[in-house]
Amino acid sequence: MSTSGSGGGNTPDLSKENVASSPNANPKKNADTESSGGSKNNRQRRRSNTKGDGSNSRNGSRTNSVSNSKNQSNRKDWTDRKSFSQGGINVKSKSPGDDHKRTRSSNSQSAKRNARDSTRTMSQASNGEGLDYSDEYELDEPFSDSDDEDSRPKKPEKMSLTVARGRIRTLSGTVPVVGYSPRWGGPTMCVSCLEFFDLPEQISGFADHLLKEHKIVVSEMNLIVDPKRYIEHWRQRFAKESIDKIFPRIEPSEGDSYFGETDYYYLMSENVAEDRSLRQRLAMRRLEEALQCQQREREDTSFQLQCIFCRYNARGNRSKIIHHLYMIHHLNLGSPDNLVFVTEYIEHLKEKLHRNECIYCEKIFPDRNTLMDHMRKRNHREVNPKNHYYDKFYIINYLELGKRWLDVLAEDFEDTMPTFQDSDEEEEDNEWCEWQEDNLDADETRVVCLLCDASEDNAQSLLEHMKTTHEFDLLKNVSDDKLNSYQRLRLINYIRKQNYHADCWVCQKTEFENPLALQKHILEHKPLSHLPDASIWDTEENLVPIFGNDHFLWMLESILEENEITCSSDDEGESEERFSKLVLESKSNTVEGVIAEDLPELSELNEDDLNALM
């Protein structure tokens, strides 16, 4: 039983909640207390929560604070005992703020929920191209039962030793960014003086300088892979040994391109073994460097580039953007295995498109829409093969020194030329026939008669069939009635529709049960020398064919066009013959040698002379 003082003393709260939470509570005693003092406890709650005088309010708040502190200590004690009874050892004491923390499972669930929200947001922002997950949480496997498990802590990243960069052994002297080409060449000192030239940009001026100042000619200088390294090598050699002991001295004669410009010159060519070896070594080193750059691009997984035509972002590998340009926009850049420096290549094309310049014919247009229409209609869906700038983006141009891919293809074609040189036209005809046989079924283009179920391979034989079997000369009727192309379409569609509904298109009778009865009836109208009234069939609804495979419509138009061409040519020949006849007739009726001054005056002529002149 509980008692409460009438004064302002502390009143212990023995309500049902606190009794149940007490660790020493007896279930039976709790039940008796609940039954006997329920009404009194209810009054105590109402008294403590009801606004009254100041003393009652203070007493109620003081009572609640005391009960709360006791509840907290009781709960803590009960939790410790429970952990120890379940086998817990060395249970750590919790701080007062830990009572309000969530349980372990709720934390893991909230973490997973945040991870899912983060993943959903990033995946939507990635435009559908791969999922970008947040680095804050580790995603669990789908349908896993790891909700009660703690999230796995990330492993700390180990520090790395700073490794000194070794000497760069590349032809260009630098390691370019992935997707970009190195620069082969640069400022170069002359082989025999202190003047500098920027090679290979100033290679023509450098060649003139060598000829005029030093009487040196370098053969095929434009084919040297790296003129800078080439000149540096020979400048060091000439410092040890004079040029006349290495290269031959030549005096130009008539017919020589240098005749009259100089008395003699030293020719640096591949005829010297050292020169040939140097050129081949430079070419091989450039090929190795290009292949290394290509391998770096293949292994690069951080590739990201936007399409030059749309908003597609290619991520992960360069082949994605190449395949996208070919499959979606039909821009053929070639196979990814033959391409190198792809990022630089595509950025160069993007700059051209920003200037509204066609990538094939390199014409500039006023706006982008005009450029796109031009590239689509002209089928300019590749780069200009005659532009040497694009040679560095294709590995095939690095294989043979001094030969572009067009030259390599031409040599391959010449090697196989004798095998089919005499039968090109026959082979093309055979290939065309084979293509037609493989891709076109002969039954799909057969034309059906307008009066029966017979079919022919072409419209000309079908017209002969209708003319001989049914005595229906369609071409004659069309020419007699002077039907235009639309009227011819309406007529054929009208006949097809009437035959389909088993109605006579000649007399418009509708009493036939099937097409066979209609065919027998049409035989009674032989010969079909005239067409029905145009008001019956010359309507707009007959412009739409009733059958989708009625090839007689377009085949008939082709025959009529050919006849018009032949008729026009015949008319021109007849007009020329008629004109020549008129010219001859006018010449025969012309009196030659008569001058107006020789004619007598009319007043001097009598009636007999006038009659003779008339």
Swiss-Prot record:
<protein>
    <recommendedName>
        <fullName>Zinc finger protein ztf-7</fullName>
    </recommendedName>
</protein>
<keyword id="KW-0805">Transcription regulation</keyword>
<keyword id="KW-0479">Metal-binding</keyword>
<dbReference type="InterPro" id="IPR040048">
    <property type="entry name" value="ZNF277"/>
</dbReference>
<feature type="zinc finger region" description="C2H2-type 1">
    <location>
        <begin position="356"/>
        <end position="380"/>
    </location>
</feature>
<feature type="compositionally biased region" description="Acidic residues">
    <location>
        <begin position="132"/>
        <end position="150"/>
    </location>
</feature>
<dbReference type="Pfam" id="PF12756">
    <property type="entry name" value="zf-C2H2_2"/>
</dbReference>
<comment type="function">
    <text>Probable transcription factor. Limits the ability to tolerate cold environment or cold-warm stress. In complex with rps-2, mediates the cold-warm shock response by promoting translocation of components of the RNA exosome from the nucleolus to nucleoplasm.</text>
</comment>
<feature type="compositionally biased region" description="Gly residues">
    <location>
        <begin position="1"/>
        <end position="10"/>
    </location>
</feature>
<keyword id="KW-0963">Cytoplasm</keyword>
<feature type="compositionally biased region" description="Low complexity">
    <location>
        <begin position="54"/>
        <end position="69"/>
    </location>
</feature>
<dbReference type="GO" id="GO:0005737">
    <property type="term" value="C:cytoplasm"/>
</dbReference>
<feature type="compositionally biased region" description="Basic and acidic residues">
    <location>
        <begin position="74"/>
        <end position="83"/>
    </location>
</feature>
<comment type="subunit">
    <text>Interacts with rps-2.</text>
</comment>
<feature type="region of interest" description="Disordered">
    <location>
        <begin position="1"/>
        <end position="160"/>
    </location>
</feature>
<dbReference type="InterPro" id="IPR013087">
    <property type="entry name" value="Znf_C2H2_type"/>
</dbReference>
<keyword id="KW-0862">Zinc</keyword>
<feature type="compositionally biased region" description="Polar residues">
    <location>
        <begin position="18"/>
        <end position="41"/>
    </location>
</feature>
<keyword id="KW-0677">Repeat</keyword>
<keyword id="KW-0804">Transcription</keyword>
<dbReference type="InterPro" id="IPR036236">
    <property type="entry name" value="Znf_C2H2_sf"/>
</dbReference>
<feature type="zinc finger region" description="C2H2-type 2">
    <location>
        <begin position="447"/>
        <end position="470"/>
    </location>
</feature>
<comment type="similarity">
    <text>Belongs to the ZNF277 family.</text>
</comment>
<dbReference type="InterPro" id="IPR041661">
    <property type="entry name" value="ZN622/Rei1/Reh1_Znf-C2H2"/>
</dbReference>
<keyword id="KW-0863">Zinc-finger</keyword>
<dbReference type="GO" id="GO:0008270">
    <property type="term" value="F:zinc ion binding"/>
</dbReference>
